[in-house]
Amino acid sequence: VNERSRSVLVIGAGVQGLSTATVLAEAGHRVRVRTSEHPSGTTSAVAGAVWGPTSLWPVERARRWAERTYGVFLELATDPATGVHSASGIVAGRTEFPESPPGALGLLDGVRPCGAGELPPGFAVGLRATLPLVDMPRYMEYLSDRFLNAGGELVHSTVQSLSEAAAESSLVVNCAGVGARELVGDPGVRPVSGQHVIVENPGLEEFFVELSDVGEWTSYMPHGQRLVLGGTAVEHDWDRTPDPQVTEGILRRCGAIQPVLHEARVREELVGLRPRSDSVRLHTEHYEGARIVHDYGHGGSGVMVSWGCAYEAAGLLLADLDD
């Protein structure tokens, strides 16, 4: 047993909570995760998910988090059991990208502009890139197993208040996602619902992601037999019930780009609540005798910064503790 081993409470079992808990448990600490939802029921499990094209604030920190995460995903992509693989595909826009290259794509070599013939009708700009794709249900299972194998404990119980958390442990990481709105009383965090349609993959190996600032766009991400189609964003919407009309719209938009998808068999329709905020909240607070590191507000980009945020959160939590 590590003599400097600490007891830590992590709130939330989405991709932020489980990644941070894994970093801490693998460093020899005693980590308990408390969650109101099984990892497979979190918003993270509904994500597409692709590393790279979306933007986050604060920009410089987010770029650093994304870079660290990219390195981890490249390693994980060598093992099929993780659910991570590298795929080639297109990031496109119907108008010019607000920043070029968008998101964290500027960190990569080998990203190149699409030729005229590569873009579907209606698109003005596009980049071809090879990016990590993450099959989130499989990945969340992998992360849970990895955390438990490192000696971690996963408990299904909702943390009702920061006082309750501080009473349980003097070291707390808050990865409550959109739940932070109530838990911390942070009105700046709001749900942005997003619907995905899962279809049987008719054989597509490339991804397509449209960057859009309106509430709907076109994307598809292949994960073996499963293809995740998107997408939508509805601000201030707490409803996790899939809408059949939204499904129709997603299928129609994706079919316009890949006609083979008009015939694809729908397996399931899923809705997640992205924890949107004007900026990621990753900082330390001293509260009722406990050190609480907040790590929430990642919007729709939580997966792409997950390992970077996890290492930074763990570092903040353990900084300057007496030896």
Predicted regions located by residue number:
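Dinucleotide-binding Rossmann-like beta1-alpha1 core, especially the glycine-rich loop
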Residues: G48-F123
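Flavin-dependent oxidoreductases
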Residues: S19, A166-R252, A256-R265
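N-terminal Rossmann-like FAD-binding beta1-loop-alpha1 element of flavoenzymes
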Residues: S7-R32
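Short beta-strand to alpha-helix junction loop
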Residues: P58-R68, G126-Y142, T241-Q245, V305
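Glycine-rich FAD pyrophosphate-binding loop
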Residues: E26-A45
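Helical element adjacent to the flavin cofactor pocket in flavoenzyme catalytic cores
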Residues: F123, L127-S169, C175
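C-terminal catalytic lobe of FAD-dependent flavoproteins
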Residues: Y142, A264-D323
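A short coil-to-beta-strand element that immediately follows conserved catalytic motifs
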Residues: V84-A87, L154, P259-V271
